[in-house]
Amino acid sequence: MKTSVVILAMSYITSIFANNSYDFCDGEFAISEKDDKCGFSFNPCTLYKQIQKEYSNCVILRFYLKAISNMLESICDNNKRCLPFSIDSLYRPLYNREQFKHKHHHTLYALFRNCLYLVNPIYFKEYQDALACNQLDVCYFLIRRTVCPKYGVTKYIECLKKRCEDRFDEKELAIFICDSETFVNIKLEIDACRKICPADCTLDICKIYSLDFWERRDLLKAIFDYHYCHVLSSDNTRDEIIKKIEEIYLNGTERDIKFTSFIIYQLFTDLVACKSSDKNIKRILDLICLYEKKDKCPSGVMVMIEFFVKVCSYQC
């Protein structure tokens, strides 16, 4: 019975990857017939939209992903020679979105990873155990695109801060906690995704500038939520600031974007990792004054300036 359930779940997922139609019938899966000899044609956007329609029914989502996890665990524990491909292919790293379509896309590992792309990080520990791999190369955006995307960045920043204060060994920080039930090695993944936070506890302005919209949003939320919750009067205030920053990055000039990136950089380096000082505060305020003289600040930049001054005043 268990085997038939697994096969049913796998068939269902296969149908999604082959862009087949599907229906839900009292908790069972109805698969339409279609020749998929060409393999899976995985489209992250299409898959996400299809799953999103039924995402409110988390029981179904967990059911077939858990079935895959059980099957992988069984594969690792039992006869590996029954596999139609090498067990080593289960551990092939995928470092970015483009590699979801690499030449090994037909393997069970790729199918497993493509589904993991949509899963809440709370399940990572189960999958990591099922694969029996302590260095599972899970892409950082697998964490970033989940229901609670800020956990990975928040905890990573927290660990960097502790390391700066307590001089923890690098190996001791190999595994970071994303939430109460998740253990994922995200340092390598964050480093691989344009190095949001390098190990020296600083943020690089150019790297912030190069982040995509969602990476920047998550980084800001992590910094605000973890380090500046005592300054912000409410979540609405934080959300308003983030909204203004988003407007700058979407509609502002290149100068506006670089300037805002610089403020974000200062928020982290001077006031968190390096601790604020009068010299640092004066330096950033002088640059703000220089910026105001040369160009009229857009409203979003002014909001950031006001927030920064408020934080500086609090720190002093």
UniProtKB/Swiss-Prot annotation:
Keywords noted in UniProt: Glycoprotein, Signal, Sporulation
Chief site of localization: other
Domain of life assignment: Eukaryota
Location in the cell: Spore, Perispore
UniProt KW DNA damage keyword: no
Sites where a glycan is attached: 19, 251
One biological process term in Gene Ontology: sporulation resulting in formation of a cellular spore
Range of residues in the leader sequence: 1-18
This protein's record includes keyword Signal: yes
Protein name (database record): Spore wall protein 30
Protein species of origin: Nosema bombycis (strain CQ1 / CVCC 102059) (Microsporidian parasite)
